[in-house]
């Protein structure tokens, strides 16, 4: 595949990639940005190029073995290093995202900031949406994973965590952990805010954002970065790769490792790969798989 050179940085020879031309009307005036799907389609590149998915690094609650979900916690020291390493890997691959999409949660925001800083691209515009948030774990949020497994049984907790369409117990609207009480969601209709979610719910809330926000940016930019979470990225991979419900349940996305897709003009993946050392990628993926069984430390 011929990758759009605008997605890449300078070549080894030092020559800069060609600049993206301004769109101008016949009179020479700069053309307005497209506002409709038809306008976007009309100016779409023959090859939209590259989509990079990045799962945030380890958080402090991952380190403490607590269910996190929509709870807003920062990266741990290890998570900070994972984010910096992700930026280094993207820089070494000469990726130059034109825009970043991320969730409203701090651990994803920090991952984006650290990665872009390492790439010397902190100026890249960032768009945020609750639709890219981690899966909401309901009443499990803030609970110790091992203690929860001891209380309810490992099989029950594994079903809550890794099934496609089974939700954990929900939060009451009066519970301070409910997103109704979080100011960052104050402008959203209350009926959109979950009290708990299964992976199927995450797929259903993520897809409108894919079509309405990410797809137009893929047509306008040679490279787009999505910085999010294990379950919101699994939802996106399910759509991109055409995975069935069981396949996506078994999918394990490692933390802090860029997953790079090369797309055709119809936004179908031509190929994908993880950046970085294959052994390290396999180790992190295996760690995520072990976490699903209730072992310590999970990036959820």
Describe the predicted segments one by one.
Residues 2-21:
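N-terminal chloroplast transit peptides
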Residues 2-6, 27-124, 128, 132, ...:
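Active-site-proximal alpha-helix that buttresses catalytic centers in soluble enzyme cores
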Residues 41-44, 60, 109, 117, ...:
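Active-site-adjacent alpha-helix immediately C-terminal to a catalytic or transition-state-stabilizing loop
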Residues 60-63, 107-111, 135-138, 168-170, ...:
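Short catalytic/ligand-binding loop motif for oxyanion handling, primarily in non-cytosolic enzymes
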Residues 117-205, 252, 270, 274, ...:
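Phosphate-handling substructures
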Residues 278-300:
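Short, cationic low-complexity segments
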